[in-house]
Amino acid sequence: EAVAKESSFSDKKKTWKFKAQNVRDFGFSTSRKFIIDAMAVDLPTNKPLAISIYPKEANPLWGDLSTKAVAHTLKTYSHFTFDYPYPKAVSVSAEDQGMEYPMICWNYGRPDEKGFVSDRIKYGMLGVIIHEVGHNFFPMIVNSDERQWSWMDEGLNTFLEFLAESTFDPNFPSTRGPAKNIVPYMKGNQKYLEPIMSNSENIYNFGANAYGKPSTGLNILRETIMRREL
C-alpha cells in the first residue's frame, strides 16, 4: 500500500489533530512513502504500541528489527525502572541521525544500494533505536534537566541501554557499559577528565564523560559492588 501511494499526489486538504498528556516537547513526521509497522507491548500496568515508520529503502532491516527493538526497549526499561506510561513509542527511519522526543524518535541505519546490511549497520541501528526510545524514560518522563545534569540523562539511559542490548542479543557489541571500554578515557590525559556532575557545556569529552563514565560506574555498582540481586 505504501509503495503504491509513493508516486501518488493529491491537492485535497486534510487536517490531523494530535493531543498528548504529560509531555514537555513534541515531534512529528509525515511522508507518503512511509510504511507503518506496529505491535502491542504487554506491561503490568499499560499496553503501549511499539511502532516503526520507514520508507521502502530501509527494508529489510527495519521491517525485520525496528519494531522488535522498540518493544524490547519498553519491556526492559519498564522492568528495571517503572512501567512506560505513554500509549505509544514510535521509531522513525532517518538517514543519518538519532534524536528523541516524547513518544517519537528518529534513528539512522539502512541497507546499502544493493540491499546489503553489515553487522556495523545492523547493530548501529539497533543501538540507536534502543538508546533514543530509552530517552522516553530519561529525561522525558522523569523530566530532568539534561543540559544541567547530563549524567542523569545520557548516563542513566546508556546504562539501561546496555542492559537492553545484552538481553536483546547476548553477543551485542555494546560500546558503553563494560568496564574495559572506559579504560582508554580514564587513563588518558587527566587534565581533560571532568566530574560526571559537570554541566554539559563544560565537558571536554562529552561522549566519554556523560555517556560512558556514568553508565560504566552504574554497571560496576550492579555487577561487582552491590550485585544484581540488590
State what each model feature region is.
Residues 45-48, 105, 130-137, 184-198:
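Active-site-adjacent bridging/hinge elements
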Residues 154-216, 224:
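Acidic/His/Gly-enriched intrinsically disordered linker/tail segments
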